[in-house]
């Protein structure tokens, strides 16, 4: 006579075999990766790039908000200034061996310079190759925001003119005049 423990074991083995038999005739879910590309959702967060303004200048103003927002501290940059007073990063470095692709840097960027692309093929054999410099990250195009130019929106100081005297600029509002 079989003990109750062996009956339970035999029943679970038969159930497992039945499940395997049912799945035997279903289509395979394997995708042959290099030949067949997988479906990537539209908001996939992949490789990070630095974009340019419509006039070809770097969008990044080295405000350091991306580095502060990064939870794993994988972004490093140093600010410098050109002759016109425009800020730009002297160096911009992302360590992709630490990056978790959370997208906080893209959300923190006021100039839309940092953008995450759907590219996910970043495999490397050596860890130092995962540290990308500004030259590796900078693209020739404007990315997701083709018409946005930070300095047209925010403005730069114009020599000889005070606030509100430049083209397309309104004079500042006196806040005290708005009070009841």
Curated annotation (Swiss-Prot):
Q: How is the cofactor bound?
A: Binds 2 [4Fe-4S] clusters per subunit.
Q: Where is the 4Fe-4S ferredoxin-type domain?
A: 50-80, 90-119
What the entry lists under Pfam families is as follows: Fer4_7 (PF12838)
Membrane topology is: Peripheral membrane protein
UniProt KW keywords: 4Fe-4S, Cell inner membrane, Cell membrane, Iron, Iron-sulfur, Membrane, Metal-binding, NAD, Quinone, Repeat, Translocase, Ubiquinone
Give EC number(s), comma-separated: 7.1.1.-
Required cofactor names: [4Fe-4S] cluster
Record carries keyword Translocase: yes
Q: What's any one GO cellular component for it?
A: plasma membrane
The record's subcellular locations are: Cell inner membrane
Q: Its catalytic activity?
A: a quinone + NADH + 5 H(+)(in) = a quinol + NAD(+) + 4 H(+)(out)
Q: What GO molecular functions are on record for this protein?
A: 4 iron, 4 sulfur cluster binding; iron ion binding; NADH:ubiquinone reductase (non-electrogenic) activity; quinone binding
Residues binding [4Fe-4S] cluster 1: 60, 63, 66, 109
What is one GO biological process annotated to this record? aerobic respiration
The record's function comment reads: NDH-1 shuttles electrons from NADH, via FMN and iron-sulfur (Fe-S) centers, to quinones in the respiratory chain. The immediate electron acceptor for the enzyme in this species is believed to be ubiquinone. Couples the redox reaction to proton translocation (for every two electrons transferred, four hydrogen ions are translocated across the cytoplasmic membrane), and thus conserves the redox energy in a proton gradient.
Q: Which family does it belong to?
A: Belongs to the complex I 23 kDa subunit family.
PANTHER family, alphabetically?
NADH DEHYDROGENASE [UBIQUINONE] IRON-SULFUR PROTEIN 8, MITOCHONDRIAL (PTHR10849:SF20), NADH DEHYDROGENASE UBIQUINONE IRON-SULFUR PROTEIN 8, MITOCHONDRIAL (PTHR10849)
Assembly and interaction partners: NDH-1 is composed of 14 different subunits. Subunits NuoA, H, J, K, L, M, N constitute the membrane sector of the complex.
What name appears for this protein in its UniProt entry? Answer: NADH-quinone oxidoreductase subunit I 1
What is the source species?
Answer: Nitrosococcus oceani (strain ATCC 19707 / BCRC 17464 / JCM 30415 / NCIMB 11848 / C-107)
The gene name on file is: nuoI1
């Amino acid at each position: 006579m079989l003990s109750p423990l062996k009956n339970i074991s035999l029943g679970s083995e038969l159930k497992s075999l039945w499940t395997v038999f049912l799945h035997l005739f279903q289509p395979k879910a394997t995708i042959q990766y290099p030949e067949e590309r997988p479906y990537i959702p539209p908001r996939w967060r992949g490789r990070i790039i630095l974009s340019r303004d419509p006039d070809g200048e770097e969008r990044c103003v080295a405000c350091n908000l991306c580095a502060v927002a990064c939870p794993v501290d994988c972004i490093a940059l140093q600010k410098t200034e050109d002759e016109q007073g425009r800020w730009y990063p002297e160096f911009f470095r992302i360590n992709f061996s630490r990056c978790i692709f959370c997208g906080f840097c893209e959300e923190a960027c006021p100039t839309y310079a940092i953008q995450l692309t759907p590219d996910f093929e970043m495999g490397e054999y050596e860890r130092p190759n995962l540290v990308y410099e500004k030259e590796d990250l900078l693209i020739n195009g404007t990315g997701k925001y083709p018409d946005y130019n930070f300095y047209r929106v925010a403005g730069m100081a114009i020599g000889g003119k005070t606030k509100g005297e430049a083209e397309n600029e309104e004079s500042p509002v006196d806040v005290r005049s708005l009070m009841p």
